[in-house]
Amino acid sequence: LIEEALLGNSDVAFAGAIGQPDAHAGELPCVYVELIEGASATEAELLEYCLQNVPERAAQPKHVEIMPELPKTAVGKVFKPDLRKKAITRVYDAALDEAGLSARVQTVVDDKKRGLVAQVSSDNSDDEISAVLGGFSRPWERGV
C-alpha cells in the first residue's frame, strides 16, 4: 500500500516499506526510498505525499528516509531484511540516546530462533539497557 502510493511520485525510483520497532504499538510503518537521478524530493515532502496518498491511516508511515540506493536482491527487488536492521538500529539508538545512555547498537544479527537481534555495545549495565529496550518486541543482547 505504502510502496504503491510512493511509486506514484515521479521522484521515486524504489520504495521499501517495513515495520519499525515501537515500544507501545509493537511496530509502526516506515519506508525507505531511492529517488530517480536528479530528483529533489525531501523526506518531509514524501511523508506529506504519503499522508495524502495512503488511504489507510494505520498504514501511513511514521518515518520516511531517502537512501542513495536501496539494497536489492539479485533479481532487482528491494531487500527488506537490511532495511529492518537499519530501522532497528535507528530506533534503538534514538531510545538509548533519549534515555541518556552511551549504549549503541553495534550490529543487528539474524538469529535462527529469535529473528533479528540487536547487539548493543556499552559501558551501561544490562539493567539500564533493558529499562530502555525491554519494551520493544525485537530482542537485544550485549555485543561481543
Give names to the regions the model predicted.
Residues 56-66, 101-102, 134-144:
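Conserved short beta-strand edge segments in small beta-sheet-based binding/regulatory domains
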Residues 126-136:
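Extended Gly/Ser/Thr-rich low-complexity repeat segments
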Residues 1-59, 68-69, 76, 81-124, ...:
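AMP-binding/adenylate-forming catalytic core of the ANL superfamily
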